[in-house]
């Protein structure tokens, strides 16, 4: 018995891969990964997509081109998203069609977000913006049908065209005092958005920014 224990311990020390079973760790294995621009990404077997590093994320294209995000071929495996502190920008089309992600917390290091960044993330119910974010792109949250509330951070001056269009379950939008412009289609077809308070600093509300029935209080 002593000899068996001795060799078992030697095996664990000599082969670190086996440590997960020796120490009881149950962390999920990385099944895909690589680099994108200055950043690194991994996708684990339990569906967690993690982006780490320092700097901006590149801009990508939609699913009909060769310039899609590197994790796009595995989009149906992604159930959770972790963006690491140090990432400064979320690129165009970065997380399009991540249909099983339910919540996203964007780190404080991110100051801007590209167009179509979270397009058609049908299960996304909540997104937390960092205080430092000053810009997000057109169509950024288009067709996020489960999104229920949005608190836009202070510092944002423009809500771009169709940014939250077709978010059918969106009921609450909190707008910052820094806001100046609400572009056309920003909240188009948000059928459950029934009342919005417009900050005093808003000087431009373009045609079709809100559903036609909406009663806006300024």
Please provide the spans of the model-predicted regions.
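Sec-dependent signal peptide cleavage junction
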Residues: 18-28
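Bacterial N-terminal signal peptides
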Residues: 8-18
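Consensus positions within tandem repeat domains that build extended binding/scaffold surfaces
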Residues: 91-94, 114-119, 137-140, 160-163, ...
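Structural signature of tandem-repeat unit edges
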Residues: 22, 48-55, 76-89, 99-112, ...
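LRR flanking "cap" motifs
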Residues: 32-89
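Bacterial N-terminal signal peptides that target proteins for export
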Residues: 1-8
